[in-house]
Amino acid sequence: MATRKLDRRMFMGLAAAGAVTVTGLGGFLALEGRVGSRLTGRSFINLFETTGGRFVGYRRNHAKALAVSGRFESNGAGAEVSSATVFAKGVHPVVGRFSVGGANPHQPDTGSGQALALEFSLPGGQQWRTAMAAAPVFMAPTPEMFYGLLSARLSGDKDRAAAFIRDNPAAAAAQKLIEAAPKASSFAEATYNSLNTFIAVGKDGARTPVRWQVIPDGNNAGTPAKIGPNWMFEALAKAIRGGELRYRLLLQPGVPGQDPTHDPTLPWPADRPQIDVGTLVLGHAIVQEQERIRDTNFDPTVLPNGIEISDDPILTARAAIYAESFRRRARETPAPVEPFGQDA
């Protein structure tokens, strides 16, 4: 098995890619690898490898993916709640990857489990990275419960998984919300949610809890034909080679002291207004971009000035887990760029 020694150059690459962050407490925990009172990022990655297999050079979760490149056309409305330059009126380069959950990059598509990770390049060398999912809420409120839920589900024992849900009301409530949410079988038509809460900091210093959504603008490609094991990705590749996919980025400000920031399983009231802050345009990524995207850690705690992490413990857990996944694959022969749509 080919491996690479983790030298100083690669360590600096880890830092540049966001595997090592220094965003307050979240950065400290990511550096240390701690996820909870007893867990570490290694605990989660070991679980993914043990239950889903180890695929050299790939992410340990969300391994199957397609890279995209594009831009964010900000309309300036987001400046109402955040001083982040991404919300000032203008255009910013974006790269990202559509993926599905799982350690196996060759798993057949099921029409569910879509995710979208993005990196916005901003003035002054700042970046905003976000890793979203086509689900309304997260599966567990704490790292410990998340680990227990994953252990039960990935064990393949349906009775064990059912017992865990039955014994953990927070996970059970989240599962009901996820199952009841509208489903889209294609990447192009799915709605992607931030899952966690963040803090928007305004120019006046006002601090507002926020969540966000990326929603299709209604003109993206329709439901694909379910032909072959990669039908979701082949349809996506065909769509972006034939044109661009367009989405709207919506910020949802919360009410401080009323809307929960610490628990990603809890939805906010449906009547909370949203702010349309601009248009996300995604298209085909050339090979050089695909290679960089493959090697990027889409750590959701990599944030620009004007956006901060909240008290949600899942955020720091995600940072540590993503960092450990990055460290392991950085020592390995890089995976090939995604081959989907080569004949499209």
What is each model feature region?
Residues 2-344:
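Active-site-adjacent core segments of small-molecule enzymes
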